[in-house]
Amino acid sequence: MAVNTAEYIGHHLSFLSSGDGFWAVHLDTLFFSLVAGVLFLVVFSRVAKNATTGVPGKLQCLVEMVVEWVDGLVKDNFHGPRHMIAPLALTIFCWVFIMNAIDLVPVDFLPQLANMFGIHYLRAVPTADISATLGMSICVFGLILFYTVKSKGFNGLAKEYTLHPFNHWAFIPVNFILETVTLLAKPISLAFRLFGNMYAGELIFILIAVMYMADNFALQALGIPLHLVWAIFHILVITLQAFIFMMLTIVYLSIAYNKADH
């Protein structure tokens, strides 16, 4: 059983990839992230197209609640023009939530379905792939730099990274190192927080599934309630992680846009 268990876990943690090493492209991550994005666009565009001023349907109510909630968060936390930030925050939350929610699909269902088409390795949760979360956080990093320059200009950006927190020319090297580390810590923490939580959640589902392979009937039976309890708890995890990624993005961009001089 030990060998079978190790092979089972290793199989479920293997990507469908093209290429080797650093340049390997995880095709399953790309596919499911695109599916999640398309699903978000289709649902929201359909609701917007069919929106009515009369009695709204359940889906329209849900979408309107999410939009108003996100818009309220942006209004409270981003002190600047929010015509771009609110749609960005909404997209981040919904996209990350949908990608996270794929983890609720039984661990063997999608790999076995893919195996019917000759695909032997498949990981369906994009946010459990560090390359995906790093890609999203790098985009946020680019927006941080963009809004910093837009708000303060290149001279303001240079002053911020050379004259803060110690406003003296002698501390320019120290200030630059401290501010650079602080800046780089933002996208890195964004990426690894989301990846770590989703990878751990995926691994726990796999370990619970391993219990069904046990020779002991009691251990097999124990897997059922454990699976149910973890799935219910994981709904909170996937929602919370999507919220945290969105909220930190809003806060980071608000700090970048802040015109107050240090």
From Swiss-Prot:
Keywords of this entry: ATP synthesis, Cell inner membrane, Cell membrane, CF(0), Hydrogen ion transport, Ion transport, Membrane, Transmembrane, Transmembrane helix, Transport
GO function term, MF aspect, one: proton-transporting ATP synthase activity, rotational mechanism
TM region(s), chain numbering: 24-44, 85-105, 129-149, 194-214, 228-248
An example Gene Ontology biological process: proton motive force-driven plasma membrane ATP synthesis
Coiled-coil blocks: none
Gene Ontology CC entries for this record: plasma membrane; proton-transporting ATP synthase complex
Recorded topology in the membrane: Multi-pass membrane protein
InterPro entries per record: ATP_syn_F0_a_bact/chloroplast, ATP_synth_F0_asu, ATP_synth_F0_asu_AS, F0_ATP_A_sf
Pfam families reported in the protein's UniProt record: ATP-synt_A
Subcellular localization, as worded in the UniProt entry: Cell inner membrane
Family indicated by similarity: Belongs to the ATPase A chain family.
Cross-referenced PANTHER family: ATP SYNTHASE SUBUNIT A, CHLOROPLASTIC
Function: Key component of the proton channel; it plays a direct role in the translocation of protons across the membrane.
Subunit note: F-type ATPases have 2 components, CF(1) - the catalytic core - and CF(0) - the membrane proton channel. CF(1) has five subunits: alpha(3), beta(3), gamma(1), delta(1), epsilon(1). CF(0) has three main subunits: a(1), b(2) and c(9-12). The alpha and beta chains form an alternating ring which encloses part of the gamma chain. CF(1) is attached to CF(0) by a central stalk formed by the gamma and epsilon chains, while a peripheral stalk is formed by the delta and b chains.
Protein name stated in the entry: ATP synthase subunit a
Gene: atpB
